[in-house]
Amino acid sequence: MKMAAVGSAKSTGPGQRSKSRPGALSAPLSLEEARCPVCSEILLEPVTMPCGHSVCLHCFQRTVKLISLCCPLCRLRVSSWARKQSREKSLVNAELWELVRLSHPERCKRRMEQRDGEIPDGEIFRAPVPVHKVGEMRQEYEKQKMKSGRSEETDERKKKMHIKEECVLLKHCQYPFCGVSDSENEEPVGRRTRHVSAFVRKTRCSPAFNKSCLHSSAAQRSRSCTDSEDGRGKSRGHTNQAVPEKANIAHSYNAGILLSSENSRSFSAPLLSLDKRHHWRGIHTSSATLVLQTKPERSISPESNDSISEELNHFKPIVCSPCTPPKRLPDGRLLEPMIVKSTPRNLTRALHKSTSYEASPTILQKWKQIEVDRQCIKVTSKGTVTSPIAEDLNLKLSPVEERDCQPCSCSVAKDRLLDLQCICGSNAHKSKSRKDKPIIYNKRRLIFDPYNKGEEKTQVAALIKTFGDSSTPKACKELCEPSEMGPPMLDSNAGHCNQGTVDPDHNIKINEPTTMSCVLNRPTSRRGKKRSQKTKHMEETLQTKISRTNRYDSLDDLIVQRMSQEKEDRELALKLQRQFDRECKKVDRHKTSRNKYELRSWGSKDGIVGYNTRRSGRVSKQNEHFNYTC
């Protein structure tokens, strides 16, 4: 195409020159001027278009007349000119054609005889053939492979370095004060606190923090150079023990709210160091000790976490995102959120609330077992209990039960049983109405009384009694007599196996023992685990409960086996029933069955039998049959 463009640029000269001087022959044309820009050969019967470009007649017909009617070089449209010249038969530029024949007669003759292949060898360009040496291609391949391998290794090394830098940066962001040494204290503060959160910066800028830093900077700097890690742990422990005793509110209601609010803010609050968070929680959760589990550090700087923790140890509200407001019920009352704590020692408060609603016997039994297990864990745990157990073990009665139950004037002679109440009749009218309608009042109460006789030990007893009709003080005294109480028992609805008692007025048996209630007697949280006791005197306290649990193990296994067998039988019966229903729904299409396909009626609606050549014999027979039956 380049050669065609060059040829065309030079071929415009003769055409334009012939137009300018029509009668005179100019000087001979050079080979480049007489070359066709399309086929790169000598011009044969050239056609000069209005734009001045000249091509061979054969090339003009192939590229212009039959295709686009445009100049192949400048894209000028020559359709009207071509039609006009074709009608006049004057497409060939005669003057230019004569000039080309005079300038290059041999080439024109050879072109007209179609002997274009006899071009001299000097004009043909031959590209040099590259000959490779032995192993040159392999060397180039290995060199390229090594280059790509080096680039991959470099990329992997860069990725590893980037990941390592990100890990170091993340660790520094999480624990900004854990690795600061004395040599780093001389660095600018901005470089060390670059990744500290805005909350810590705000705390540092507070006036109280500045005062504490001024007072404690010299002492902490000297201590960081001289004290050992153990000494620092002890001093930190003494500092933490200096917190006011008002902070010791782990078992109160406000402490639970503080814990729940802190847990809900754990994702929105700024990320402080690990030992600070443990110290803040240790004040609330551990009522026995305030010793911290400190993390070993290389040194403590004046701007370290101790100075910040001195500000945070006081009970001030944490400035962070507000908590979610409590939900409101449709009647307008606020729904108190459920508080979940980490240690079983603090989970006893939920059962101390008065319950005035009706609960199922299974739920009451589970509540009792959970309360007993938690009290055992609380007594036998390693931590010391700040509050007496008697205060924690006394369960309050509901307001409904306090109205119904009136304390009698009977005296308990031998045992020191606290909060023992009985139900006495208020008047004779109520007793008569009760005799008319034999109604059994079954009051379920959970009473945990400390039993101290001769030695310091606490007996956890769940006393739930069922009272019938007792209108006289004598009957009330008999019920309140401690010699007749025996071991603590629950009624049949609460889940224990006990002896049945008979109502003398109505001759109705109350508290019938059930086998199903014995299964629920076992503790839920400590079932199948070895109990670790702190002291030996507690073993005698829980011996009765352990023996009762072992007594019903065999019965428990039997009932579980029976229930599993019933479940398997029920599943088998359902499977057989489904199979039977499937067989009943299946339609039998055999010849002898009643569900077989019905035959088509041979008669039409009008009583005229249709004619069919294929079934003419059968149609006639069927018609005769119908006529005979009718």
UniProtKB/Swiss-Prot annotation:
Q: Which CDD domains match?
A: MIU2_RNF168-like, RING-HC_RNF168
The protein's annotated catalytic reaction(s) are: S-ubiquitinyl-[E2 ubiquitin-conjugating enzyme]-L-cysteine + [acceptor protein]-L-lysine = [E2 ubiquitin-conjugating enzyme]-L-cysteine + N(6)-ubiquitinyl-[acceptor protein]-L-lysine
Task: Give the ZnF (RING-type) ranges.
Answer: 36-75
Q: Cite the residue spans of the region called Disordered.
A: 1-24, 220-247
| Gene Ontology MF, one | ubiquitin-protein transferase activity
Might you name a Gene Ontology BP term for this protein? Answer: negative regulation of double-strand break repair
Q: What is its EC number?
A: 2.3.2.27
Q: Identify the keywords attached in UniProt to this record, alphabetized.
A: DNA damage, Metal-binding, Nucleus, Transferase, Ubl conjugation pathway, Zinc, Zinc-finger
The cellular location(s) given in this protein's UniProt record come to: Nucleus, Nucleoplasm
A single GO CC term for this protein reads: nucleus
Return the broad EC class.
transferase
Q: Where is this motif: MIU motif?
A: 565-582
Where does the record place Basic and acidic residues bias? 224-233
Q: Where is this motif: UMI motif?
A: 155-163
Q: Which domain of life is it from?
A: Eukaryota
| Pathway listed | Protein modification; protein ubiquitination
Query: Gene3D superfamilies from the entry?
Result: Zinc/RING finger domain, C3HC4 (zinc finger)
**Positions occupied by motif LR motif:** 599-611
Q: What is known of its domains?
A: The MIU motif (motif interacting with ubiquitin) mediates the interaction with both 'Lys-48'- and 'Lys-63'-linked ubiquitin chains. The UMI motif also mediates interaction with ubiquitin. The specificity for different types of ubiquitin is mediated by juxtaposition of ubiquitin-binding motifs (MIU and UMI motifs) with LR motifs (LRMs).
What function does this protein fulfil?
Probable E3 ubiquitin-protein ligase that acts as a negative regulator of double-strand breaks (DSBs) repair following DNA damage.
Belongs to which family? Belongs to the RNF169 family.
Query: What protein is this chain from?
Result: E3 ubiquitin-protein ligase RNF169
Gene that this polypeptide is encoded by: rnf169
